[in-house]
């Protein structure tokens, strides 16, 4: 009954991944991001991650797998997803939704830390403000974006962009794969 729809969805996902893989810059950016994150951890730094909606879930998933574990047991790594409901509701109410991530970065970010900002469109105003706050703190910035990178294009030390212009879920599917690869590479870098 829905077999054609299922095949079409899986084929589109495979095509999106194939297009992402065609650009060697993406592979190099993932490797550079993993090394940057591991170097931050080795130097006593941490990663703060943020995003909205599904990207927020990806930010939490990234932090959880760093503080917990991925595939193998190992020490936890310092990662915080900006997801505290009381913080988000307080800042959202008192300052505005666009400030929910930047206020947190201002409060706990420091030089040597890394911000991972995730936005499928690259146009999330609150993530863009978090990037600006991270820069003011002397932090490094990694972004996961989609489409043409939106307003976030060119704002990061390392941008990993999924050049897909359809629905956001295809971009999110690549983002979560990139997140898993980053964790795998970080684990390898941490034991060097």
Curated annotation (Swiss-Prot):
Keywords: Carbohydrate metabolism, Cytoplasm, Isomerase, Metal-binding, Zinc. Pathway: Carbohydrate biosynthesis; D-glycero-D-manno-heptose 7-phosphate biosynthesis; D-glycero-alpha-D-manno-heptose 7-phosphate and D-glycero-beta-D-manno-heptose 7-phosphate from sedoheptulose 7-phosphate: step 1/1. Binds 1 zinc ion per subunit. Zn(2+) binds at residues 61, 65, 172, 180. PROSITE patterns: SIS (PS51464). One of its GO terms (cellular component) is cytoplasm. Substrate binds at residues 52-54, 65, 93-94, 119-121, 124, 172. It comes from the Bacteria. InterPro entries: GmhA/DiaA, Phosphoheptose_Isoase, SIS_dom, SIS_dom_sf, SIS_GmhA/DiaA_subfam. GO terms for molecular function: carbohydrate derivative binding; D-sedoheptulose 7-phosphate isomerase activity; zinc ion binding. Its cofactor is Zn(2+). It catalyses: 2 D-sedoheptulose 7-phosphate = D-glycero-alpha-D-manno-heptose 7-phosphate + D-glycero-beta-D-manno-heptose 7-phosphate. It is found in: Cytoplasm. NCBIfam families: gmhA (TIGR00441), PRK00414.1 (NF001628). Homotetramer. The reaction produces a racemic mixture of D-glycero-alpha-D-manno-heptose 7-phosphate and D-glycero-beta-D-manno-heptose 7-phosphate. PANTHER family: PHOSPHOHEPTOSE ISOMERASE, SEDOHEPTULOSE 7-PHOSPHATE ISOMERASE / DNAA INITIATOR-ASSOCIATING FACTOR FOR REPLICATION INITIATION. This is Phosphoheptose isomerase. It comes from Escherichia coli O7:K1 (strain IAI39 / ExPEC).
